[in-house]
Amino acid sequence: MKQYKTVNNLVGWITFLIAATVYCMTIEPTASFWDCPEFITTGYKLEVGHPPGAPFFMLVANLFSQFASDASTVAKMVNYMSALMSGACILFLFWSITHLVRKLVVTDENNITRGQMVTIMGSGLVGALAYTFSDTFWFSAVEGEVYAFSSLFTAVVFWLILKWEDVANEPHSDRWLILIAYLTGLSIGVHLLNLLCLPAIVLVYYYKKVPNANAKGSLLALLASGILVAAVLYGIVPGIVKVGGWFELFFVNTLGMSFNTGVIIYIILLAACLIWGIYESYTERNKARMVLSFILTIAMLGIPFYGHGTSSVVIGVIVIAALWLYLRPKTQAAVKEKFRVSARTLNTSLLCTMMIVIGYSSYALIVIRSTANTPMDQNSPEDIFTLGEYLGREQYGTRPLFYGPAFSSQVALDVKDGYCEPRIKYNGTKFIRKEKATPNEKDSYIEIPGRIEYEYAQNMLFPRMYSSAHTQQYHAWQDIKGYDVPYDKCGNMIMVNMPTQWENIKFFFSYQLNWMYWRYFMWNFAGRQNDIQGSGEIEHGNWITGIPFIDNWLVGDQSLLPQELKDNKGHNVFYCLPLLLGIIGLLWQAYRGQKGIQQFWVVFFLFFMTGIAIVLYLNQTPSQPRERDYAYAGSFYAFAIWIGMGVAGLVRLLQDYAKMKELPAAAIVSVACLFVPVQMASQTWDDHDRSDRYMARDFGQNYLMSLQESGNPIIYTNGDNDTFPVSYTHLTLPTNREV
């Protein structure tokens, strides 16, 4: 086992060096398009970017920017940060694959044969390198964006739960869980995508704690993981701001104290409750106090108070009462032992919660820097209330998920005083600082209506075609005949044509699942037609294989395309080899007995939650401003695990059907399968090598240099690709233009 650990560490670091070297060689030397210039600027100058911000990314980017020789190399340093983090992501992917394969291949941990060693290392190397050279991950690895950092968090926390699995029965194994919680809290300050790893993590925990796990228990574990995700995403993240806001209102508006007094007192009390709860659950001196301190901490974090206004308070009181009734000593003594909540469980839960809060506290940076009125100060989140709006991304609006209007739905109307009025609802209220009439006037907040939303007369389940601004695009993607619904327009009865539920589902499969997910998936593991953004046309942005008869069936004869499309650098063909390896790997894993099927469900839910679950949540409309494959990198990461396992699956096939010994079979398969990532690298290098791209920087400079040098000229920009390069050039690079 010692020899295995040495080899595993050595090959893992070699994989890291390969990936990091490739990414550092191909980084963009300056800012890229889209959000990159903004993130680089906010990192370098610690300014406030678009909601919901990325404060921990800003802090680490600022650290890397200190290595810049001058302002012109700041972007390069931040891009190096992404490259190194992406290389580290590959390292942890390698170790995750070797861990999972070892569990299925090795029967005696103290006597790992050479054949088993080669199988495990070959699996890790092929899977990790396939992901290294995949289209989506390489794209994010060479630019200053949050997705490389987020991918590293995903890789690390998944690897950590596998490390915990090895030591789960040791006395201090909970420290791995606490470290996962801390990294989860930190990841909130980068991107919320990392929370989607929690179901896979919970399954690993369940399968280790319950060796004879069954389907019912697995479903309950998944339900618990969903509650855990909701507790962080809809509990802690907005809850701390909500309860802190209540304290702020009480101390400022009621007691007449100055701004931020309530927030400071809330932070002190929250810290005190956490420490008290941890102390009581550690000492176990008084069970009633232990439960009380735990529930008080949960309440102070705002986890039970879901929603807005009075309803959130009612929900919170009900949840708190239910927790007390279940956790109180009398109830715990009456229930069966397997349903009891131990002091260790409460203590670990509170420690994990505290670490999440510590990680999440990076958002204090946003308020501090906004108060300093930095040049870029989007939404100006200077107090607890504006921070809540900033975190909630309220400027982006909402979209229906389970029930809501279709694109043709009409606003519900009510007759009032002889006039027709649209039916509207207010989502809570907002509080803003009152402008003082005199310097001696006390600080106070005033209440204003919250976000206003229209109510619609016609609604449907699972609305996928909901945007009235995209009516033509829906019809272009789907042959919509619909059905007529009567609509009373203030006494004038008209018919509204609504899409059928089946047409709605067909759009979900044809556009949202196929075009906006499956197409990206196949880019990475089958091949890509070109890098021109597609909107459904046959010659732009489709996935291909490089196998003529398949491609002819999919998108027509590619030899008939214009030469400029044939020569497009984004034309990459993998002949479906990574896809086939992944399918072999997932089948091999699923059929390796109970341990194999348990592993399969762990990897599957990592794959599902970071892929299809995001598709369901985003509910995207046609004509997106850019390709969205970067959002699903975690799903492709999970599939890379199966690609690595494909090596072990092929070794098994040679052993079973060619009657080969394990060592030669493992050596042959590992060497042969290494040609898959080599083929991927040969195809994707030219379109991912950004080492000589300066277009975004030049674009921003051209905008600024076209302005007059004095007189404070005003410039109007259109969208991300106009605004952010200009902001980067103006705020990061030295210019002589005061805009």
Annotate each predicted stretch with a short phrase.
Residues 24-25, 71-79, 104-117, 124-151, ...:
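Aromatic- and kink-enriched transmembrane "portal" helix at the membrane-lumen/periplasm boundary
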Residues 729-738:
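Conserved small/polar residues in nucleotide/adenosyl-binding loops
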Residues 1-22, 88, 108, 113-125, ...:
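Start-transfer (signal-anchor) and selected internal transmembrane alpha helices
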Residues 13, 80-112, 156-160, 580-587:
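Transmembrane-helix motifs of polytopic, lipid-linked glycan transferases
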